């Protein structure tokens, strides 16, 4: 089904009698999930992590549910071969379109970012704006999650198709990115929102741009913070928290390792060593061809 440039299997050297030492798997379509990884470093410093970026098939936000399910199953099958103890879908589109389905198909816990983000948003405001990929917006996942908690909250959603490509192309400082952000935020500002949710894990990377365009009283919710808090609670409940020193984070991508490494250094503070995983026959996205 796939091949890797590294040896498959239990690279972390833990025994089956020590499940606490197994790594947490984290995946996203690209570098956006690094915002979740940074939170793991802060909140769960003893945990080892395997990070996967499906860069050959990004952006996910314009894909159908059937495509997303195929991609997610590919990744989870690979994660299972790496003997992870838990997986975090550091991708709102996957969380919206695939989480409930694949949770029933694997024997390790799988956490998504939407419910933790929705809970945090409801605690902060009553007029909530959500910026996300078009697929997440179309799914209404955030609105439904928020209304299940508090049906009296007003929710507005805006799909932002240009954000992920701009971030993956490292164009955050580009004036064009600011103008795109202004256009996406304007309808939410007109609705006098009091809270904004980053409905895509890429979007915290745009924080300086977005904050400069929002009224100062608008609170910003980063679901990455809250999904890792949920991970902490889940690990404690399952008795899977690691008390040993962590091993170095392992990075893998389906696209170009060098491109991911160059982008990742901006958010990690170090240059990650990245391996390539080839899911046989996957169609490489036009964006990935442009980045190559």
UniProtKB/Swiss-Prot annotation:
Its UniProt entry gives the catalysed reaction(s) as: L-glutamate = D-glutamate
Pathways involved: Cell wall biogenesis; peptidoglycan biosynthesis
Q: Where is the active site?
A: 91 (proton donor/acceptor), 200 (proton donor/acceptor)
Q: Which GO terms describe its molecular function?
A: glutamate racemase activity
Report TM segments: none
The record lists substrate as bound by 28-29, 60-61, 92-93, 201-202
Q: Which GO terms describe its biological process?
A: cell wall organization; peptidoglycan biosynthetic process; regulation of cell shape
- Which EC numbers does the record give? 5.1.1.3
What keywords are annotated for this sequence in UniProt?
Cell shape, Cell wall biogenesis/degradation, Isomerase, Peptidoglycan synthesis
Q: Which family does it belong to?
A: Belongs to the aspartate/glutamate racemases family.
Described function: Provides the (R)-glutamate required for cell wall biosynthesis.
> What protein name is recorded for this chain?
Glutamate racemase
> Lineage, please?
Bacteria, Bacillati, Cyanobacteriota, Cyanophyceae, Nostocales
Q: What gene does this protein come from?
A: murI
